[in-house]
Amino acid sequence: MSGKIKIGINGFGRIGRLVMRATMLRPDIEVVAINDPFIDAEYMAYMFKYDSVHKTWPGHVNGSKDGFLVEGRKIHTFTESDPSKINWGAAGADIVIESTGVFTDIAKATAHLTGGAKKVIITAPSNDAPMYVMGVNHEKYNPATDHIISNASCTTNCLAPLAKVVNSKFGIKEGLMTTVHATTATQKTVDGPSKKDWRGGRAVNGNIIPSSTGAAKAVGKVLPELKGKLTGMAFRVPTNDVSVVDLTVTLEKATTYEDIMKALKEASEGEMKGVLAYTDEDVVSSDFVTDPASCTVDAKAGIMLSPTFVKLVAWYDNEWGYSNRVVDLALHVAKKAAVKV
């Protein structure tokens, strides 16, 4: 036994592939199986190796009809549409990363347990699964009852650490969030049908598209003290990766912008190091491609109108930062549950 935590990935899309890349950079976790009904092993290898945003994987990757090999290690591959038919147990996967965007509630995600998985982490918000954000409420994870959990969204992972620090130090009376969000796979390259979201059906290139997001309200689930105090919306913009949160809040306690930045900087160097980061340089979005932090506070971009009314700005690589938190959460779950350590 290698001593590494063994995980499986269901859905080899943007997050699935980047979660795998993130595990390759860690000594204590490895992917042993991948399921995707739309991709064979040869195509998996190609999609893993070449990435338009995060560049070519520098190591050895090979895919054939016989399997998918990374750095000489064979990855079990499945092409099942029904998650209950995936033999995770035979592949040795104890924790499954559910990254299809389809099986996002407890009833659907529980199907992975039938195949031998012990725990499931959903890489999307869930209506009923407990939601955990690293650096915010992950210590509340209960291995005895939490078999299916959610890692929330990339935007919630950026917003929640920021809101936690500000609320704990100065108190948030109420606030509005806007995320200027990079393109995602659900958007269209040319105008097309989108019955539930007409504006979302417009071409991604050449448009700034207003959109809804539950990210701000979801903060109330991981930080109950902020329930009902935050809401927000999104603008989808034609960039490949990296998004930015604008959090505008009314504070309970009068303060200065400098003191807020001091509190955030201290948190980034202390209890939230690795999750929350801080910069006072003249940065732009591309500077954060493949940045592993959930949230990087931009000290120069924020503004304050009065001692209790402030706009805070924070960057996040909505793909790579989030994928690293998925891996962190899997390691935390394994540690708490003592899964094959």
Curated annotation (Swiss-Prot):
Cellular compartment(s):
Cytoplasm
Residues given in the record as NAD(+) binding sites: 14-15, 36, 318
The record's annotation in PROSITE patterns points to:
GAPDH
Specify the domain of life of the species encoding this protein.
Eukaryota
Pathway this chain belongs to: Carbohydrate degradation; glycolysis; pyruvate from D-glyceraldehyde 3-phosphate: step 1/5
Q: Which reaction does it catalyse?
A: D-glyceraldehyde 3-phosphate + phosphate + NAD(+) = (2R)-3-phospho-glyceroyl phosphate + NADH + H(+)
One Pfam family recorded for the sequence = Gp_dh_C
Q: What is its EC number?
A: 1.2.1.12
Q: Which GO terms describe its molecular function?
A: glyceraldehyde-3-phosphate dehydrogenase (NAD+) (phosphorylating) activity; NAD binding; NADP binding
**NCBIfam families registered for this protein in UniProt:** GAPDH-I
Q: What's the subunit arrangement here?
A: Homotetramer.
Main role? Key enzyme in glycolysis that catalyzes the first step of the pathway by converting D-glyceraldehyde 3-phosphate (G3P) into 3-phospho-D-glyceroyl phosphate. Essential for the maintenance of cellular ATP levels and carbohydrate metabolism.
Miscellaneous comment:
Algae contain three forms of GAPDH: two cytosolic forms which participate in glycolysis and one chloroplastic form which participates in photosynthesis. These three forms are encoded by distinct genes.
* Protein's recorded name: Glyceraldehyde-3-phosphate dehydrogenase, cytosolic
Source species taxonomy:
Eukaryota, Viridiplantae, Chlorophyta, core chlorophytes, Chlorophyceae
Protein's gene:
GAPC
